[in-house]
């Protein structure tokens, strides 16, 4: 799988306008042009599974442009595609002269904010179980400066430029699959997997649609989708320790449940991961193997291969706790 959510770069740029001496100059309104620089770059599957179909971080039709004054108050909003599109550059004219900065956001069903600060708050709102296509992406230009003038209907307006990088704020964690092999009696059909501590100390429980028919079967949550969560990056590290319990179906021996405790992750170079970054998706495959589970069912010792996907793509390996005193 390639990139997941690559950040979109929106550039408020220069419009090719004629600046003729006989035209009228009007400083009470202005023009701004926005170019989506990498809107054609493929990212990753639109579902939460490991499909190969790619999609972009945000299509032009998803983006709303917030034109704001110096204080950040939004004085006008327009859809990105409402601008004049010339080879990917969207030009907006006759904007209020109070416009000093621009925000670009995929609202994903949210109401248009009254300020850029409110837009940033929407962007940072935790949507733990939202799918990738429903995560808000946002960026702002900061204070812009006049670069030139732009001729519109025989009138020259001031042309301002700035740069806006539109990107996801969250870091994302996806459990792609659980592999159950030889869990007791050679076959360990199961009906439920419970995940603890990932969502800020809470519990997530998934009742599986299909019980495993063989010890080599692979289980995923729902219809081939991953278990996935979106965190504010400063909170992600607090969710490093994860307990996963597989619950037996018709299990006849003494231990009806098997538990894995993940207490760390490594990248593809074997280095510990201590922080999780915005715009990154961390993908993980978890094997439940009888040989890796302690007889007391308290701790295990397993290295699990993990793949990091980006909104940028990485590869990580969870490490598991084996010391019951820690």
Where in the sequence are the language-model features?
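Intrinsic-disorder/low-complexity, polar/charged segments enriched in Ser/Thr/Lys/Arg/Asp/Glu/Gln
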Residues: 29-33, 87-89, 159-161, 172, ...
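Short loop/turn segments at strand-loop or loop-helix junctions that form parts
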Residues: 35-39, 105-109, 139
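C-terminal motif of bacterial Sec signal peptides marking the signal peptidase cleavage site
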Residues: 15-16
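Tryptophan-paired
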Residues: 42-120, 152, 172-280, 312, ...
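Positively charged n-region of N-terminal signal peptides that target proteins for export
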Residues: 1-4, 19
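Extracellular beta-sheet/turn segments enriched in Thr/Pro/Gly and aliphatic residues
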Residues: 124-168, 176-178, 261-326
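Sec-dependent N-terminal signal peptides
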Residues: 4-12
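A short, Gly/Thr-enriched small/hydrophobic beta-strand-prone motif that recurs across taxa
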Residues: 21-45, 166-180
């Amino acid at each position: 799988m390639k990139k997941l959510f690559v950040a979109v770069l929106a550039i408020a740029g220069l419009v090719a306008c004629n600046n003729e001496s006989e035209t009228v100059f009007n400083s009470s309104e202005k023009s701004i042009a926005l170019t989506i620089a990498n809107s054609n770059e493929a990212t990753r599957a639109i579902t939460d599974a490991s499909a190969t179909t790619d999609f972009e971080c945000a299509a032009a039709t998803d983006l709303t442009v917030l034109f704001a004054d110096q204080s950040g108050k939004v004085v006008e909003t327009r859809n990105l595609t409402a601008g004049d599109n010339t080879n990917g550059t969207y030009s907006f004219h006759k904007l209020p002269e109070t416009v000093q900065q621009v925000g670009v956001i995929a609202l994903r069903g949210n109401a248009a904010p009254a300020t850029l600060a409110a837009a940033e708050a929407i962007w940072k709102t935790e949507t733990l179980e939202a799918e990738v296509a429903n995560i808000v992406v946002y960026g702002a230009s900061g204070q812009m400066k006049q670069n030139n003038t732009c001729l519109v209907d025989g009138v020259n307006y001031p042309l301002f430029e700035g740069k806006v990088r539109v990107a996801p704020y969250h870091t994302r964690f996806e459990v792609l699959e659980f592999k159950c092999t030889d869990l007791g009696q050679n076959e360990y059909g199961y009906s439920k997997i419970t995940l603890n501590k990932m969502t800020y100390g809470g519990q997530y429980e998934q009742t599986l649609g299909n019980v495993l028919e063989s010890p080599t079967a692979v289980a995923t949550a729902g219809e081939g989708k991953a278990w996935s969560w979106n965190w504010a990056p400063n909170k992600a590290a607090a969710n490093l320790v994860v307990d996963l319990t597989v619950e037996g179906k018709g299990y006849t021996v003494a231990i009806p449940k098997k538990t894995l405790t993940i207490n760390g992750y490594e990248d593809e170079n074997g280095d510990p991961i201590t922080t999780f970054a915005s715009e990154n998706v961390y993908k993980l495959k978890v094997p439940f193997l009888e040989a890796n589970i302690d007889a007391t069912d308290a701790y295990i010792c397993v290295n699990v291969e993990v793949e990091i996907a980006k909104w940028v793509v990485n590869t990580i390996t969870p490490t598991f706790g084996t010391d019951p005193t820690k």
